[in-house]
Amino acid sequence: MNIQRIFIGALPSQDTRAFRLYWRSSQTDLAGLLLLQRLDIREDLCGGIEGRLSCISTSTGVSLQNFLGQPLTVQMVTDTGALQSICGIVTDAHEGESDGSLATYQLVVRDALSVLERRINTRIFRTKSTLDIIQTLVREWRTRSTTLAATFDIDMSNIDASKYPTREQTLQFDESDANFIRRLCRREGISWFIKAGGQGSSDLTQSPFH
């Protein structure tokens, strides 16, 4: 990926701004490319993350494919001065108007579970519990996508597995993996939420993870 930039002076530093945008450290061409100007992000319990990020750049005509599928971290300064991080994956991107020197871009960001909406399937799971099925689906997606493997996982450490017995068969019928997982969780009374960071320590400004 080679992004040609128009030199009109560097974009302002985001280090002292109320909200900041970070890409994976390996995405060097994206570092400093966009300056976050406005954000509208919604987080739902037993739902997910969906946000729109409005950015400016000194580069016009950047291929939107450079953004799609890329994990990122948005950090916001709270009223106590602490930083709150939200991690997600870019699922859509648009280029807006340009005055010849500055261009505008809008990114749509969602959580990894929402990405699982892209596969619709019909299958039967035999002699598996709800937790087994969820782990199987997540493992399949993390195996087939290096991006997902590096940017999200599921934590079931606070769930008592003994409360969810093995079922003779469980049917997924013409529904996405994400909707199937949500349906199973609601049926079993399992709540979930999306949280930035993994079970191990990591710098979210270098390695977005949720």
Language-model regions, residue ranges each:
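Amphipathic alpha-helical and helix-coil boundary elements used as assembly
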Residues: 1-210
